[in-house]
């Protein structure tokens, strides 16, 4: 039972990972990524990861 729950959680998390779009825009904070993501993908869903913006759909 625990294994099936873990597999289900892994599948759900991997779906979210596949929807993320990396950009080459440098950033120091997530707030800087919101207008970039809005312009590139139509939604202001994004955050700064490792110095670059990552947008979510």
Curated annotation (Swiss-Prot):
Cellular component aspect of the GO annotation: extracellular region
Isomerase in keyword set: no
One Pfam family in the UniProt entry: Toxin_2
Gene3D superfamilies: Knottin, scorpion toxin-like
Expression (tissue specificity): Expressed by the venom gland.
UniProt site positions, description: Basic residue of the functional dyad: 47
Keyword Protein transport attributed: no
Residue positions, PTM Pyrrolidone carboxylic acid: 21
Site feature Aromatic residue of the functional dyad, where: 56
Entry similarity comment: Belongs to the short scorpion toxin superfamily. Potassium channel inhibitor family. Alpha-KTx 01 subfamily.
Role: Potent blocker of both large-conductance calcium-activated potassium channels (KCa1.1/KCNMA1) and voltage-gated potassium channels (Kv1.3/KCNA3). Has also been shown to moderately inhibit Kv1.2/KCNA2 and weakly inhibit Kv1.1/KCNA1 channels, as well as 5-hydroxytryptamine 3 receptors (HTR3A).
Free-text note on domains in this protein's UniProt record: Has the structural arrangement of an alpha-helix connected to a beta-sheet by disulfide bonds (CSalpha/beta).
Protein name as catalogued: Potassium channel toxin alpha-KTx 1.5
């Amino acid at each position: 039972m625990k294994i099936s729950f873990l597999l289900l959680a892994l599948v759900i998390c991997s779906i979210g990972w596949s929807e993320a779009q990396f950009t080459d825009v440098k950033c120091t904070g997530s707030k800087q990524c919101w207008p970039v993501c809005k312009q590139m993908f139509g939604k202001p869903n994004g955050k700064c990861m490792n110095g670059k913006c990552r947008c979510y759909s």
